[in-house]
Structures are given as C-alpha cells and as structure tokens.
Amino acid sequence: MSKFPVPLRTIGGLRPSTTAAISAANIGFTQSSRALSTGAAAKSSGLVGQVARQYPNAAAFSIKQVRLYSSGNLPKHNRVALPALSPTMELGTVVSWQKKEGDQLSEGDLLCEIETDKATMGFETPEEGYLAKILIQEGSKDVPIGKLLCIIVDNEADVAAFKDFKDDGASSGGSAPAAEKAPEPAKPAASSQPSPPAQMYQAPSVPKSAPIPHSSSGRVSASPFAKKLAAENGLDLSGVSGSGPGGRILASDLSQAPAKGATSTTTQAVSGQDYTDIPLSNMRKTIAKRLTESKSTIPHYYLTSEIQLDTLLQVREKLNGLLAKGTSGQATKISINDFIIKASALACQRVPEANSYWMDSFIRENHHVDVSVAVSTPAGLITPIIFNAHAKGLATIASEIVELAQRAREGKLQPHEFQGGTFTVSNLGMFGSVSDFTAIINPPQSCILAIGGASDKLVPDEAEGYKKIKTMKVTLSCDHRTVDGAVGAVWLRHFKEFLEKPHTMLL
C-alpha cells in the first residue's frame, strides 16, 4: 500500500498517482499487451496538452508506450525507465524499492521512491505483471532520465530467466540524453556460420573490453555526456581509463575520476580541523542552480515600503472571532500572511505586469493570479501555490496554506501543487528576528515580495503628542525586463492600500 495517503484526483480523464507518478509526464514506461483504445490515447494527449499549458517553460512532455521484445533466449518483457516526475527533472536518485524481484505487480502499486530536483516522490507500477529484475539499486544517485530501472514480465515463470540480466543499453522509451551511443561496430569479416537474425529494439552487442589508457599525446577521449557530467561536478578526466571503444571515457567511468586539483589518494584532515561534508541532494542542487541563474541573468531591482498594521490587526481579530463562533472553534485562524497573499493577488490584478512571465521572445500576462508561498522544509525551500488567490476568501486561503505547508514539510506535495505560480510571497517576518530583506525572483515570474517582521514605532500624534503603531516592512523584487520602476511603485501602492484599509479588499 502506498505510504502517501493523498486523495486521488482526476485530471483530463486520467487518474494521476497518489505519489505523482504521472502528473509531470515524460514517463518512460512500456505499455502492456492490452491495446490502447482510441479514447485512452485521446485522454493521454489531453493530459500532455494540459501540462504543457500549465508549465510553459518546461521541456516538451510526452507519454511514451513501447513494447520491447525478447532477445536471445529471453522471453518477452517490458523495460521500465526512470520517468521525469517534474518538468525540470534531469537526474533522479532511487531512494527505496517498495517491491522486490519476483513480486506480483498490479497497476497503480507503488514501485519505488525517487528523489527528484523538487522532492521525494513515488513511482507507481505502469502495468500488471511480475517484477523480474531491478537494474538500479537503492541509493543510486544522479540516474539520468530514461535509464533502465527494472524489467517487468507478464508471467511468473519468466522471472527466473532474468536472474543474470544486465542492461544492454537498448532504448527503454525514456528521454535520457542521447550521448552514450557507441559508434557502429565495424562489419565483421565473412564467416561460414550464419549470424542470428536481429531482434526488434535490440541494440547491437558490443564486446566489453578492458579499459584502455589514454594516449601519450595527453588528449582525453570522452563522450559528450561524460564531459558534461565531469564539468558540472568538477571532475578531472585526465587520469580516468575509459571502458568505451578505443578507450573512450563513458559516464559509467566517472566514479574513478578525482575532483580537479585533488590527488587520487585520500588525505587526512589538518590537525585541529573538525567538519562534516554533507552530500548535496537533488533538491539542493536544483535550488543552487536555479537561484544562481536567476540572480545572474535577471536584472533585479528592489522597492521597499513600510506598512501600518493596526487596522488590519483589528479586522483580523474580529474575523477570527466570527469564525470561531460559526464553526465552534474548528476553523483555521486567519493570519497576517493570509491578508498578504490576498492583497498581493488583488494588486496583481490592478497591475498585470507584475503577474507576467518573461518568455525570452515575448512577455506573457497571466489572467489568473496563482500565488506561490515559500515554505521551509528539512529538504529545502519549496513553494506550494494558492491557485486563483484573487478569487478566494481569507478563510479559504488560510485553510489551504496550512494544509499545503503541512504536506510540503512531509514531502507529500504533487508537482502541480508547487510548479506554475505567477507571483511569489516569501515571509521571514514570522521568525521575529528579520526586519526586512530582499528575495530572489523565481523565473519565469517577474516579481517576488519579501515580508519582514512587525515592530512597534512611535509617530507624532496631535492629541497626545505621540502614539505607538505597529508597522511592517516589505520589499518587492522586480524583473526590469517586464516591470519598470514606476510600474513596480504603483503595484506597491495598491498593495499598501489593501493592507492599511482591509475593507477595500471587498470592493
């Protein structure tokens, strides 16, 4: 039974998995012998279109069904590849297998848990059968999309035939980078014995030779994919013996590559130094990559405003009192953050430039306001979305954000719940130690609002000479390509008015 008890939902007539196995498409699994009906194919096409519309900057999605047949003495079988469980996923880590070799599988069973660039999600069994062979073991990191995960067969009697099965590199219907293709082997000399007939979807068999050292010229021969991985991870290929044709370095050879500037032998830490090296999760790598790209490619500028909260706090107290009476104290209390989300959405309706996407060759103004709310989790930052926040009441926003934040910390969010927002709110004021800060824009969005903490301030008063008020500083980060300075100032003026005069949110 799945360990993610999330209610099933229907999208475009298809049943997405409880654990997001299909919601972000590009699934590299094979189809069972049951033929797809015209209606099912149409539904699949509809789902792909819906996902593409929701994630305009994501790579093209596809749901591929490929039947892979037997080779040699192996019976017919299905190859299940690592799927893309989020639009931005490139690599994955197999956290755990929920089934073991020989287990019977029913369509929809939780097959394994995969750590993506966003969260740890479950991958459901694509079809009925028996798990004949697991190719990627638990704990395997940075597995590329399309890499062969496991083998499924229709009959239990066929499981034993795959005991010694190894991945031959044949296509498994995924979308892994096409970089590790070995060159076509030379045509063998004529032989008196006829060669066996080629099998459908069977890759040519290339004898695996012992690693060949590099030539004395110093030139390193490596596949494009291996070079890409080495560059991203700072690995030195000069001392690696390749196992590919002619000594070419493949991605599988990188485990022996030392970091650039490091020696191949393990060195002891200098006496007196005490530290722990923490491996990077896929989520942390993605956060680092995306925020670095955002800060280095988006022309940020910042607008700060101080907002008086006294009237809002009075309205909040009255509304929470009414909610408590009407629901016997069961309703979620409205927080200042809920007012902020609502006011942000309404201000985006007044100033649509702030609710737009930068699409490189054009600007897309979104007609709905989906507010992403930054939530800190043990694994890193994630941004669940309040969809159509401009059209929702404060009580609805309050209950949704509490539920989404809880599931975010438990790692139970599905991709469509945290990808595709149009505006982001990041609130560090609740920690009580932050007066103001600036936040980094989440592309392709144009703005992010940073919320500081509330503090007391003395201001002049005609009656008593001075009075104490409660204020809060907010800073709007804007993309100057889509939001000019004056436009950002107008947005901030509307936002300030909504919070200082909360009744205007009802107009």
UniProtKB/Swiss-Prot annotation:
Catalysed reaction, written as an equation: N(6)-[(R)-dihydrolipoyl]-L-lysyl-[protein] + acetyl-CoA = N(6)-[(R)-S(8)-acetyldihydrolipoyl]-L-lysyl-[protein] + CoA
Enzyme class: transferase
CDD domains tied to this protein: lipoyl_domain
Cofactors that this protein relies on: (R)-lipoate
UniProt main location, coarse: mitochondrion
Coiled coil segments of this chain: none
Cellular component, GO annotation: mitochondrial matrix; pyruvate dehydrogenase complex
Keywords of the record: Acyltransferase, Lipoyl, Mitochondrion, Repeat, Transferase, Transit peptide
Domain (Lipoyl-binding): residue spans on this chain: 77-153
InterPro entries: 2-oxoA_DH_lipoyl-BS, 2-oxoacid_DH_actylTfrase, Biotin_lipoyl, CAT-like_dom_sf, E2/Pdx1, E3-bd_dom_sf, LAT1, PSBD
GO biological process, one term: pyruvate decarboxylation to acetyl-CoA
Pfam families membership: 2-oxoacid_dh, Biotin_lipoyl, E3_binding
One function term, GO molecular function aspect: dihydrolipoyllysine-residue acetyltransferase activity
Record has Acyltransferase as a keyword: yes
Cofactor detail note: Binds 1 lipoyl cofactor covalently.
Residue(s) carrying N6-lipoyllysine: K118
Active site: H480, D484
Domain spans labelled Peripheral subunit-binding (PSBD): 221-258
Region (Disordered): 168-223, 248-270
Key word Transport present: no
Localisation per UniProt entry: Mitochondrion matrix
Role summary: The pyruvate dehydrogenase complex catalyzes the overall conversion of pyruvate to acetyl-CoA and CO(2). It contains multiple copies of three enzymatic components: pyruvate dehydrogenase (E1), dihydrolipoamide acetyltransferase (E2) and lipoamide dehydrogenase (E3).
Family: Belongs to the 2-oxoacid dehydrogenase family.
Protein name as annotated: Dihydrolipoyllysine-residue acetyltransferase component of pyruvate dehydrogenase complex, mitochondrial
Originating species: Caenorhabditis elegans
Organism taxonomic ancestry: Eukaryota, Metazoa, Ecdysozoa, Nematoda, Chromadorea
